[in-house]
Amino acid sequence: DTSRTIIVQFDLGSAKLSPAARSSLNGAMSTLLSARQIMIVGRTDNTGPLAFNESLALARALAVRDHLLSTHPRLTPTLSVKARGACCFIAANDTLAGRTQNRRAEVIFQMSGENLP
């Protein structure tokens, strides 16, 4: 797999980017500007109603997208956004630490000549 991923964490019930998340995205900008495709996938833990989690997952992905586009609008044609509020957890949701890891957005990107899965 040749995709690369940047993980952006979020607080419980929030789609607001933290200063650390903004810094991480800004630090990766030179690489992202060279990417052929960028997919931003918003995710949640399993607490709360499904409809809320789907909406929150989308809001997280859009927050990342909006931050990237606010400084580099030329990324627009390379970006896509998905929400995955009810699946694909990277950690068990039965612990606080696991739920914290699942509250994230993934910025998955391919460089020139590669394709996203």
Region spans (language model):
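Short, solvent-exposed beta-strand edge segments and adjacent coil->beta transition regions
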Residues: T5-I7, R104
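Periplasmic OmpA-like peptidoglycan-binding domain that tethers envelope proteins to the cell wall
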Residues: T44-P117
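Residue-level signal for pocket-adjacent positions within structured domains
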Residues: T5, L12, A91
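Periplasmic peptidoglycan-binding/anchoring modules of Gram-negative envelope and division proteins
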Residues: Q9-G42, L62-S70, V107, E114-P117
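Pro/Ala/Gly-rich low-complexity, hydrophilic intrinsically disordered segments
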Residues: D1-T2
